[in-house]
C-alpha cells in the first residue's frame, strides 16, 4: 500500500458564520501553515439590517425599539445614546431622579454584558463550570430589569427628558441585596478563574496590544484600558450624574487577553460601587421632563382628521430636531458607542451615523492572530468581546 504524501501547501479554512465561538454570524477565512495562522480575513454583513437608514424615516420615539437590537446584550446603552442626542440638540434638562435611575440601569446593564462575555469566553477556552455560575448571577440582573421595565431584554425604558416609569415599590431594597450578594460572587470568580494555571496558560501573553497601537487602531473600552490607557468617557465627558459618585477607572498595562479579562472583572465591582451610591442618594421628584413632549408649531386642526388618528397614514406631530449637527457618545461595556446626528427641523433625523465599538475593535483581529496558533483565535476573538448586531447594524 502506497502511503500518501503529506501536503506542504497552505490550507484555507472557513470559521463560521455558523460556529459556536463566533459570537454571532461572523465568518473568518483563515490561512494556515499547519497550526500557525498566516492570514485571517473577517467577512462581515450577515446581520446588516440598515439601522442607520431606518432612523431617517422614524421619529425618535418610534426608533427607540429598533436601537435595542444593535447590542442586544447591553440595550440600556443604545437607548441612552438615542435619547441623549436629541436632548442635547433641544437643550432639554433631565430631572435629577431620572438621571440617577439612568445611571443605575446603565451600570446594571454593564454588569449583565460583562457576565455574558465572561461565561462564553471561559467556555471558548475550555472551562465549562464558570459558565453556569455566571448565568445564575445574570438572571438576578434580568429579574431587576423585568421588575423595573417589564422586559428582561429590549427594555424600551429611556425617553427624551427622562425615563418611561418610576422604580416600583421594593425595587431599591432588592437591588441593594443583589449588590451585596454579587460582590461575594466576584470574589468566587477570582478564586475559580484568575489563579487557574490552565486558564493562565491560554490567555497570558496572547493577543498583546501596546498603548500606542491601541490608540492608532482607534480602540476603546476595556480593549484600550487593558493596554495601559486609563480612558473612560464616564470620567472624561461626565455625562448623566457620573461625576457625583466616587469610583476608579480600571486599567492594566500588559495589553494581553488576561489584562482584558482583569479589566472587565474589576469594572463589575466598580459598577456595584456606583449603583450602591446612586441608590442610597436617590433624590425625589419627577422621573420625566414633561415639557420635552411639547413642540413649537401652532396647533393644526388637520391633526384630528381620520388619517392622522386612526389609520396612521401620516406621522403624528412630535418632538422636532433643530437644524444642527452633533456627535454624542457614552461608555458602553464594549467601548465608545456614539452617534453623529444631523437635524433638519423635522421629527425625523436627516442623518443618523452610528459609531459602534465592536466594529472598530474587531478591525485589529487579523493583526493579532497572525503568527499565532489556530486555537488562539478563539481566545483573542473572545477577549475582544463583539456582538454582531452592533458590528453589522
Curated annotation (Swiss-Prot):
Record-stated family: Belongs to the complex I 49 kDa subunit family.
Principal subcellular localisation of the protein: plastid
Physiological role: NDH shuttles electrons from NAD(P)H:plastoquinone, via FMN and iron-sulfur (Fe-S) centers, to quinones in the photosynthetic chain and possibly in a chloroplast respiratory chain. The immediate electron acceptor for the enzyme in this species is believed to be plastoquinone. Couples the redox reaction to proton translocation, and thus conserves the redox energy in a proton gradient.
Reactions accelerated catalytically: a plastoquinone + NADH + (n+1) H(+)(in) = a plastoquinol + NAD(+) + n H(+)(out); a plastoquinone + NADPH + (n+1) H(+)(in) = a plastoquinol + NADP(+) + n H(+)(out)
Protein name per the record: NAD(P)H-quinone oxidoreductase subunit H, chloroplastic
Subunit structure: NDH is composed of at least 16 different subunits, 5 of which are encoded in the nucleus.
GO-annotated cellular components: chloroplast thylakoid membrane
UniProt entry tagged with the keyword Chloroplast: yes
Membrane topology classification: Peripheral membrane protein
InterPro entries for this protein: NADH_Q_OxRdtase_suD, NADH_UbQ_OxRdtase_49kDa_CS, NDH1_su_D/H, NiFe-Hase_large
EC numbers for this chain: 7.1.1.-
UniProt source species: Draba nemorosa (Woodland whitlowgrass)
Secretion signal span: none
Lineage top rank: taxon: Eukaryota
GO biological process, one term: photosynthesis, light reaction
NCBIfam families documented for this protein: PRK06075.1, PRK07415.1
Coiled coil: none
Gene3D superfamilies given in the database record: Cytochrome-c3 Hydrogenase, chain B (1.10.645.10)
Protein location: Plastid, Chloroplast thylakoid membrane
Alphabetical keyword list: Chloroplast, Membrane, NAD, NADP, Plastid, Plastoquinone, Quinone, Thylakoid, Translocase, Transport
Molecular function in Gene Ontology: NAD binding; oxidoreductase activity, acting on NAD(P)H, quinone or similar compound as acceptor; quinone binding
UniProt keyword Chloroplast, yes or no: yes
